[in-house]
Amino acid sequence: MGNNRTWSQSESLTADQQKEKLQPPSMYNVVLNNDDYTPMEFVIDVLQKFFSYDIERATQLMLTVHYQGKAICGVFSAEVAETKVVQVNRYARENEQPLLCTLEKA
């Protein structure tokens, strides 16, 4: 009842061939975008809550958003980046803030 199939040499892959086929996942930047209405304290809260930054780093990133128009909050695989964007945007809307989180290919 077992599968008695044997592998021919043409069907097997060498370790080098397997490494060539494996590609690291595409990575994406999660970006917070500036607006004229979201309080700075709310941006800091988002950075701590969803990206686990301490108060000092969250404040630095908030100031980058404020003065440069946007800041990269982290670099993640597609699935994680998409989840972070949805979570942050949902949280902003629930708190009646126009803060916008987006993703872009790293």
Curated annotation (Swiss-Prot):
| Residue ranges with Polar residues bias | 1-16
Q: Which superkingdom heads the taxonomic lineage of this protein's source?
A: Bacteria
Q: Name one GO biological process term.
A: proteolysis
- Which portions of the sequence form the region Disordered? 1-21
> Pfam families, per this entry?
ClpS
Assembly with partners or alone: Binds to the N-terminal domain of the chaperone ClpA.
Q: What does the record give as the function of this protein? A: Involved in the modulation of the specificity of the ClpAP-mediated ATP-dependent protein degradation.
Q: What does the similarity note say?
A: Belongs to the ClpS family.
Q: What is this protein called?
A: ATP-dependent Clp protease adapter protein ClpS
The organism is Pectobacterium atrosepticum (strain SCRI 1043 / ATCC BAA-672) (Erwinia carotovora subsp. atroseptica)
Q: Which gene encodes it?
A: clpS
